[in-house]
């Protein structure tokens, strides 16, 4: 990144001097200034609730735009909730409009930045490239009630004689939904779960206390989980083939697309010079994969990634 013409403090001072809205502009701390003026390499910011994350991210955008490092439409902001996305988008637009009223920044005519949720971005990525997998991803993601109904239909019509489970139908549906969600989230195949389950069952049988009630309960649960796996696979394949996708499905498929097709990453990097991530969850394997560089397996070093947590 080239030398900045304006420091964060100078930009804030110019805004504070404006007679109409100057009183709305809060001063920044040294720590916030360092975050706002950081380079274009990935960076992690640890900040608690109420510490001024939204304002700092907004000022980061002002700094980049004021110094010509990026235009508003080259900045992508991702948040965890729609509420947070709305708040950040409104704050950025407001600050950019205020900046454009200063004589030095009259040339700034656009205040449009791409601020959305992680799931919405995944849905957009999937809709643009779903044809690569031959699926229909134009429909809105299914809600919990619709997903539950499909799971109920799969469970009630399951006819595999090898399936063994004495639980109530409602419990099986709940287990089916929970296991499929975890498999999508952590990108685990049914065959891998079954292999590990069988290995653990063998080890349980070798334990000296393998006949006690606790050990038998664990073994029983693992056998039931393994017997549930074919049903989970059928549930997931049915929805994928019909385009009946949940938010978790969209995130998982978007991650697959980002990882398996190098040109997708190239296209996205061409759109956005800067990426700001709010409440980034590195415990979500799909989210990590979607936002990672396919070659280096890390967040793209050509972009700025501010990660307030």
Regions found by a protein language model. Give the residues of each.
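Conserved small/polar residues in nucleotide/adenosyl-binding loops
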Residues: 295-301, 307
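A ubiquitous short alpha-helical element
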Residues: 44-46, 76-79, 137-138, 216-223, ...
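P-loop NTPase Walker
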Residues: 1-135, 263-266, 275, 285
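Walker B catalytic acidic pair
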Residues: 279
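ATP-hydrolysis module of ASCE/P-loop NTPase motor domains
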Residues: 107-112, 130-224, 272
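Conserved helicase/translocase P-loop NTPase motor core
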Residues: 118-122, 224-274, 284-290
């Amino acid at each position: 990144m080239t030398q900045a013409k304006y420091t964060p403090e100078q930009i804030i001072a110019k805004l504070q001097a404006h007679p109409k809205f100057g009183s709305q502009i809060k001063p920044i701390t040294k720590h916030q200034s360092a975050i706002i003026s950081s380079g274009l390499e990935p960076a992690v910011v640890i900040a608690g609730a109420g510490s001024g994350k939204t304002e700092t991210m907004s000022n980061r955008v002002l700094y980049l735009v004021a110094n010509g490092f990026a235009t508003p439409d080259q900045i992508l902001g991702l948040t965890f909730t729609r509420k947070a996305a709305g708040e950040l988008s409104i704050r950025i637009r407001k600050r950019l409009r205020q900046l454009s009223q200063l004589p030095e920044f009259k040339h700034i005519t656009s205040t449009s930045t791409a601020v959305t949720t992680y799931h919405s971005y995944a849905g957009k990525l999937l809709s643009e490239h779903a044809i690569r997998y031959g699926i229909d991803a134009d429909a809105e993601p299914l809600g919990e009630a619709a997903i539950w109904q499909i799971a109920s239909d799969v469970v009630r019509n399951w006819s595999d004689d090898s399936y063994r489970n004495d639980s109530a139908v409602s419990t099986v549906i709940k287990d089916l939904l929970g296991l499929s969600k975890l498999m999508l989230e952590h990108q685990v195949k049914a065959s891998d779960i079954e292999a590990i389950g069988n290995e653990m069952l063998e080890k349980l049988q070798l334990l000296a206390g393998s006949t006690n009630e606790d050990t038998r309960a664990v073994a029983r649960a693992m056998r039931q989980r393994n017997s549930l796996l074919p049903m989970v696979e059928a549930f997931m394949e049915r929805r994928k083939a019909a385009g009946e996708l949940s938010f978790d499905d969209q995130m998982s498929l978007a991650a697959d697309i980002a990882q398996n097709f190098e040109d997708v990453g190239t296209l996205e990097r061409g759109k956005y010079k800067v990426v700001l991530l709010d409440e980034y969850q590195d415990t979500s394997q799909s989210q990590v994969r979607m936002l990672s560089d396919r070659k280096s397996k890390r967040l793209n070093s050509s972009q700025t990634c501010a990660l307030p947590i």
